[in-house]
Amino acid sequence: MSKVKLTKENIVSLLTQSEDVEFEEDQNQVAFNFKTFCQENLDLIKKMSITSCLTFLKNRQSIMKVVKQSDFTFGKVTIKKNSERVEAKDMTFRRLDSMIRVKLIEETANNENLAIIKAKIASHPLVQAYGLPLDDAKSVRLAIMLGGSIPLIASVDSLEMISVVLAIYQDSQVQELGIEPTKYNTKEALGKVCTVLKSKGFTMDDAQDNKGKEYAKILSSCNPNAKGSIAMDYYSDNLEKFYEMFGVKKEAKIAGVA
């Protein structure tokens, strides 16, 4: 019996006919590996500057809406608006986004580039929302990860522990971070990260455990509630005038809110 391609028509045959049906193995057994995909496609974005990469992350949602309006082509690659089946070699917005984050993380190995990224990414909405302190390369790498597909990035060598620790942090701080469970299931994301690590045979030995603790220490110092305070400080002089008009001192009001 010859094997057939996994198509809509052949699925119908599988469900409605008495003949034996088997699909080609390259379609139902080959799992997607983002690490391999990234290695094969990073050249597509090699011309992107650090600033351009950061611009992409800062405007991710707006860019995604434009890209998904129709088939989007850049260079020789097309992100299809509609696709019944996403193949292992197909480019998707999520894969593109993850590649850009990996590229930026690699750039942090250079001190000059690290300084540029640190200065620019501090103003990104998610970094401010998390109240993430940017003190060193590890904290900057965490900042780059925020908002990205952690399960995809977890497959890249040396990014396993930063991925699993960030996934755990998000799962443990759902309410504090204002994460909407119906839009992003943190428990499911953590499960996917662990599945990726297990499939690549990753071992959490003492060295990896210590590495994870360093990332956990940084995340434990985050203050998700700091965003509002930072914004209030920005308008400090103006706010004080209005507080006084209501007969309330600004400092007392802020202390009450905190």
Swiss-Prot record:
Where mainly located?
Answer: virion
Q: Which UniProt keywords apply?
A: Capsid protein, Helical capsid protein, Ribonucleoprotein, RNA-binding, Viral nucleoprotein, Virion
Q: Does the keyword RNA-binding apply?
A: yes
Show the Pfam families listed in the entry.
Tospo_nucleocap (PF01533)
> What molecular function terms (GO) are annotated for this protein?
RNA binding
A GO cellular component annotation here is:
ribonucleoprotein complex
Localization recorded for this chain is:
Virion
InterPro entries reported in the protein's UniProt record: Tospo_nucleocap (IPR002517)
Does the keyword field hold Ribonucleoprotein? yes
Q: What is known of its domains?
A: The N-terminus and C-terminus are involved in homooligomerization and play an essential role in viral RNA synthesis.
Q: What does this protein do?
A: Encapsidates the genome protecting it from nucleases. The encapsidated genomic RNA is termed the nucleocapsid (NC) and serves as template for transcription and replication. The NC have a helical organization.
Q: How does it assemble?
A: Homotrimer. Binds the viral genomic RNA.
- Give the family this protein belongs to, as stated in its UniProt record: Belongs to the tospovirus nucleocapsid protein family.
Q: What is this protein called?
A: Nucleoprotein
